[in-house]
Amino acid sequence: MMQRCLRLPKPLALRRGLHVAQVNGQAVATEAPEAEPQDAFERQYLKERIEISPFQRVFLGAGSSIAALLDPRRHDMIACLGETTGEDALLTILDTMQASEEGQRIMADKPRIHTSTIDFKYLETLPPDTFGAAYVKFLKDNQVTPDSRMAVRFLEDPKLAYLMTRYRECHDLIHTVLDMPTNMLGEVAVKWVEALNTGLPMCYGGAVFGAVRLRPKQRRAYLKHYLPWALENGKRSKPLMPVYWEKRWEQNIHELRSELGITVLNKA
């Protein structure tokens, strides 16, 4: 079977996992046969992913953005929007992961965050000023569970699919380290931090359109306190995706915030 040839800049071709060869004096990228999956996540994902054409991707992206705008409670549409618009940002995140020793370990291990993989009984025994204890307290105070995240289905590259999965499963951990609740104000503020930190379009959309739904009193607090704080932390903080949160349970949460360049908003 003939391989499809693509005339792409060499760095972009290599970034997308293509082979680069010289043809008539020009660098040409050729699609290689799909490599054998290297781990359980990739094997499972390749069984369950839904393959879509470029046209379907555009159609799904447009449709899900309209549906999410009309009804922000449609988490399925928000998830679809993230997958159909986030590939370029995910490629940049992948570069960031590969440039960090901690990020490389995450990509090698591909840890998952739900009740079947995290020892929450152990976290409950940790001192209250540790990250693990703060995470458990966040889950209880906000009555949320790590098992509620939707599975990724529409991304072609399993590595990018894992990064989107990782982003979703770490969302509550970002809430924890930012000390933000899951109410509308907290969600919009966290989305701004995530948008500036990851570059994911869906985060920008959630931040902008989520703010529209704030009530007048909330909007005043948002503009005066939450938005300036979120923008400052989003721009100043270190990349959060390469943080191996599961290795930080015992770390003092104040030291962790200092390491990541995060400050907590004084809500008084």
Swiss-Prot record:
Cofactor requirement: Zn(2+)
Catalytic activity entry: a 4-hydroxy-3-methoxy-5-(all-trans-polyprenyl)benzoate + H(+) = a 2-methoxy-6-(all-trans-polyprenyl)phenol + CO2
Pathway where this protein functions: Cofactor biosynthesis; ubiquinone biosynthesis
Location within or outside the cell: Mitochondrion inner membrane
Domain of life: Eukaryota
Any Pfam family: Coq4
Residues binding Zn(2+): H171, D172, H175, E187
InterPro entries xrefs: Coq4 (IPR007715), Coq4_euk (IPR027540)
Enzyme Commission code: 4.1.1.130
Membrane topology, as annotated: Peripheral membrane protein
Keywords: Lyase, Membrane, Metal-binding, Mitochondrion, Mitochondrion inner membrane, Ubiquinone biosynthesis, Zinc
GO CC terms: extrinsic component of mitochondrial inner membrane
EC primary class: lyase
GO biological process, one term: ubiquinone biosynthetic process
Subunit: Component of a multi-subunit COQ enzyme complex.
Record-stated family: Belongs to the COQ4 family.
Chain's role: Lyase that catalyzes the C1-decarboxylation of 4-hydroxy-3-methoxy-5-(all-trans-polyprenyl)benzoic acid into 2-methoxy-6-(all-trans-polyprenyl)phenol during ubiquinone biosynthesis.
Misc: This protein may be expected to contain an N-terminal transit peptide but none has been predicted.
Name of the protein this chain belongs to: Ubiquinone biosynthesis protein COQ4 homolog, mitochondrial
Species annotation: Drosophila yakuba (Fruit fly)
